[in-house]
């Protein structure tokens, strides 16, 4: 049996200066949605991928929270030697996006090169009450546990 392995990276944790300017939503969604790279995509609590950046910005402005780190950018990557199918990665992206969808707007894009990976872009301002995603260790750990649970259903091992 071949074991597929996956890793999670919380981008703004390794690059704390990222995602603080007013063009963050548009820039990151444009990069991740590049048609030369993205093979699939989806949204939660957004009308469409086309309007996602403006909708996220509007939510932040509505609650006067258009400052500081604006996006939670999470990458879930899979090892190339045992590549999962695109439909499997789409189901995984959808299940992982639902973790945030009760309070936050989410867009995800799936890229296939150099390794299959999911870019999950979460607006850090809640559309429910305007509170910012706290991004504490416990929050990241809860998401990691959720992803581990989702992946285990596909026989994929999540590395720490």
Question: For each predicted feature, which ranges?
Answer:
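N-terminal nicking endonuclease/strand-transfer module with a His-rich metal-binding environment
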Residues: 1-160
């Amino acid at each position: 049996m071949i074991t597929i392995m996956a890793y999670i990276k919380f981008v703004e944790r390794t690059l704390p200066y990222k995602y603080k300017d007013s063009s963050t939503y548009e820039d990151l969604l444009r990069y991740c949605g590049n048609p030369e790279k993205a093979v699939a995509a989806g949204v939660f609590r957004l009308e469409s991928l086309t309007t996602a950046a403006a909708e996220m910005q509007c939510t932040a402005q509505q609650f006067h929270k258009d400052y500081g780190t604006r996006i939670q950018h999470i990458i879930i990557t899979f090892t190339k030697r045992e590549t999962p199918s695109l439909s499997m990665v789409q189901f995984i992206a959808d299940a992982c996006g639902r973790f945030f969808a009760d309070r936050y707007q989410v867009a995800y894009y799936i890229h296939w090169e150099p390794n299959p990976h999911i870019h999950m872009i979460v607006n850090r301002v809640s559309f429910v009450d305007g509170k910012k995603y706290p991004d504490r260790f416990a929050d990241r750990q809860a998401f990691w546990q959720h992803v581990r649970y989702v992946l285990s259903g596909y026989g994929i091992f999540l590395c720490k």
